[in-house]
């Protein structure tokens, strides 16, 4: 499989030591630093991390309960690069966060589930966004939310009012399913890096295809497109690792919960097309996992 050649290519493309390629965090971190420097920007120093603090956990991907039995004519729909696409779609980056819905209701619901001896993952079963986010998207006038802005101020308003502030006013803002508000006035570094990696991989795949019967050239481009694939698939997990310089729970959970909403909609729409009912656990859906439905 030529792992040493692959590791060498990863090291050169991301300017890290060969031994650093054995993990994803340091490689991804250096790639983001390189992208910032390419834009003429300076990256802030690493934040102090209290090793004695309790580990933080983000809500994971949606995994449906499979419908048991022998099924005929099964089809699958898979979203291409779900997590990188979510990061790009909402322009997620530490520098584009405008505010955060304080998860008061969400924390209460999760703690209530834990008091019933449920796991953290079980507390999020059939929940496709924070409770505050759902209230905003439902334009609930009777539900009050608290927004913590990045300038240090906080404001209370109804969920319906916040919907208008984010989506109806002239603010260039987007709201993730985690209740994190991002601006799209400028492109964040991480989404820009993902965009470049994705475009470069497509170009390398094209050159690999155009190589025809030239096996040496095909192998050359195949190795390089594989590096881009590894970079793309590694980034989300790396930035959700507390050891990463760019770790931010708001971004990590924004990715997973927004991904949940997309997968839920995909399953519900597929069931509607086949069975006539918009329902993500409808009769036509037998399973779903992270970025796919069956």
Outline where the language-model segments fall.
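Catalytic palm active-site di-aspartate
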Residues: 201, 232, 282-294
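Common nucleic-acid-contacting/processivity interface regions adjacent to the catalytic cores
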Residues: 1-94, 100-101, 107-108, 112-114, ...
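Generic surface-pattern signal
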Residues: 2, 6-12, 37-41, 88, ...
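Short secondary-structure junctions
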Residues: 271-281
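Active-site cores of enzymes that catalyze phosphoryl transfer or operate on phosphate-rich substrates
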Residues: 166-244
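Charge-dense polyanion-binding interfaces
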Residues: 34, 94-186, 191-192
């Amino acid at each position: 499989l030529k792992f040493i050649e692959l590791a060498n290519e990863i090291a050169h493309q991301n300017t890290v030591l060969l031994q650093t390629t054995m993990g994803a965090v340091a490689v991804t971190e250096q790639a983001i630093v390189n992208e910032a420097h390419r834009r003429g920007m300076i990256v802030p120093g690493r934040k102090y991390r209290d090793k004695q603090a309790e580990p933080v956990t983000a809500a994971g991907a949606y995994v449906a309960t499979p419908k048991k039995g022998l099924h005929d004519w099964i089809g699958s729909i898979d979203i291409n690069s779900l997590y990188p696409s979510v990061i790009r779609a909402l322009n997620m980056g530490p520098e584009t966060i405008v505010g955060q819905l304080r998860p008061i209701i969400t924390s209460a619901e999760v703690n209530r589930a834990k008091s019933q001896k449920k796991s953290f993952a079980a507390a999020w079963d059939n929940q496709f966004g924070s409770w505050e986010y759902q209230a905003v998207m439902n334009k609930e006038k009777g539900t009050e939310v608290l927004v913590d802005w990045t300038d240090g101020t906080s404001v209370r308003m109804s969920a319906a009012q916040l919907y208008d502030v984010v989506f109806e006013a002239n603010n260039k803002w987007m709201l993730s399913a985690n209740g994190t508000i991002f601006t799209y006035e400028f492109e964040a570094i991480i989404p820009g890096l993902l965009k470049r990696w994705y475009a470069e991989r497509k170009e390398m795949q094209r050159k690999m295809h155009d190589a025809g019967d030239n096996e040496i050239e095909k192998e050359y481009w195949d190795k390089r497109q594989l590096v881009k694939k590894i970079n793309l698939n590694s980034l989300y997990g790396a930035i959700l690792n507390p050891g990463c310089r760019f770790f931010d729970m708001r971004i990590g959970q924004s990715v997973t919960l927004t991904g949940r909403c997309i997968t839920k909609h995909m399953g519900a729409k597929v069931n509607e097309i086949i069975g006539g009912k918009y329902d993500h656990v409808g009769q036509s859906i037998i399973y779903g996992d992270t970025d796919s439905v069956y």
